[in-house]
Design a protein with these regions (language model features):
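Sequence/structural segment immediately N-terminal to covalent heme-attachment motifs in c-type
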Residues: 27-49, 54
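C-terminal capping alpha-helices of c-type cytochrome domains
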Residues: 82-125
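Cleavable N-terminal signal peptides
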Residues: 12-13, 23-25, 29
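Solvent-exposed, acidic/flexible segments
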Residues: 28, 32, 47, 79, ...
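Short glycine/threonine-rich turn/loop motifs
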Residues: 28, 52-72
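Short Fe-S-cluster ligation motifs
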Residues: 67-87
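Positively charged n-region of N-terminal signal peptides that target proteins for export
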Residues: 1-4
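Bacterial N-terminal signal peptides
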Residues: 9-19
Length: 125
């Protein structure tokens, strides 16, 4: 009987923990998949490639990661990366920094939001 109660309690706790996961986490899972598919040609989370590393980008000043050789335009932009600035950047980088090196654009607002939520979730840790 004690084993049955223990197993039932474990199952109930697992059920509660699984279904109490915040909705933002679900978005982050899709965002991670989109990030890996759409962004990792140039970016990594923790290492520099042809683009800067992106873990911790939320709250970071533009052009401020010392491990990446930013353009003069990006260094002089002086914005802080948040949902709004990242959305503008991913929509049309040229509108924020003319003659930048990022030739990539994302027209799908839902995909941008998922990737931004994913990057934000990584910056919160």
């Amino acid at each position: 009987m004690k084993i049955l109660i223990s197993c039932s309690a474990t199952a109930l706790l697992s059920f509660i923990l699984f279904f109490s996961t915040p909705v933002t986490h679900a978005g982050s899972v899709k965002g991670k998949e989109l990030f890996e598919r759409r962004c990792t040609g140039c970016h990594r989370l923790d290492e520099v490639r042809s683009g800067p590393r992106l873990r911790g980008i939320f709250g970071r000043k533009s052009g401020s990661d010392p491990s990446f050789p930013y353009s003069t335009g990006m260094k002089s932009l002086r914005i802080t990366w948040d949902e709004s600035t990242l959305d503008k950047w991913l929509t049309d980088p040229e509108s924020l920094v003319p003659d930048n090196d990022m030739a990539f654009r994302m027209s799908d607002a839902a995909e941008r939001a998922e990737i931004i939520a994913y990057l934000k979730s990584l910056s919160a840790h």
